[in-house]
Swiss-Prot record:
EC number: 1.-.-.-
Protein name, entry field: Putative NADH dehydrogenase/NAD(P)H nitroreductase Lcho_1290
The keyword NADP is annotated on this UniProt entry: yes
Cofactor dependency: FMN
Keyword Oxidoreductase: yes
Enzyme class name: oxidoreductase
Organism this protein belongs to: Leptothrix cholodnii (strain ATCC 51168 / LMG 8142 / SP-6) (Leptothrix discophora (strain SP-6))
HAMAP family recorded: Oxidoreductase_RutE_HadB (MF_01204)
CDD domains associated with the record: RutE-like
GO molecular function: oxidoreductase activity
Length: 197
């Protein structure tokens, strides 16, 4: 990869992108959700384990199941979002290793007896993939509102029952209303956050 992205792209992904809490009344096309996955899935993970799992909440019935499980302060903005994505991590990601890592013979069987390692790997790599998911959404012209304020155990029971998936983040998706933004908070500068050794 030899070409840096232009300033417009960097602005859309990073410097001008915001976490949105208010949403314009504009639908998100279903095919855009498929595009989002097809883009985000290419981000790197350890051993290509790819533990991220997503439930896109769009319909009224699914919304009615999710909204009571959100923290009170997150319910109204979640109800207003065109799409709500529940981002989970599959602790049993090893079941897909023959497909994801065909070069690693026996990986599924080795991980089967290592639940603690699978838990740790799913946490780290699921979080990585959640970041890729947000950047992919921004790249496709969507705004994001990621949140941690929800009853994770209840969401697991409601949306991931019978699986080893554990909820990490609920992320509202759509076209944000800039009127709902507060002034942008600062970030740490290079000298505070980094060192060159």
């Amino acid at each position: 990869m030899t070409h840096a992205l232009d300033t417009l792209a960097l602005n859309q992904l990073f410097t001008e992108a915001r976490t949105h809490n208010a949403w314009r009344d504009e639908p998100v096309a279903p095919e855009l959700l498929r595009q989002l996955h097809e883009l985000a899935k290419w981000g790197p993970t350890a051993m290509n384990c790819c533990p991220l799992r997503v439930r896109f909440i769009v319909g009224a019935e699914a919304r009615a199941r999710l909204l009571p499980l959100m923290s009170e302060g997150n319910r109204a903005k979640t109800a207003a979002a065109p799409v709500i994505a529940i981002l989970g991590r599959d602790v049993d990601f090893h079941q897909h290793m023959p497909t994801l890592a065909p070069h690693m013979a026996g990986a599924r069987e080795r991980f089967a007896d290592q639940p603690a390692q699978r838990e740790a790997m799913s946490q780290l790599n699921g979080a990585l993939e959640a970041g890729y998911f947000i950047l992919a959404a921004r790249a496709l012209g969507l705004d994001c509102g990621p949140m941690g304020g929800f009853d994770a155990a209840a969401v697991d029971a409601e949306f991931w029952a019978g699986t080893a998936v554990r909820s990490m983040i609920v992320c509202n998706l759509g076209h944000g209303d800039p009127a709902g933004l507060r002034p942008r908070a600062p970030r740490l500068d290079f000298d505070t956050a980094c060192a060159v050794l």
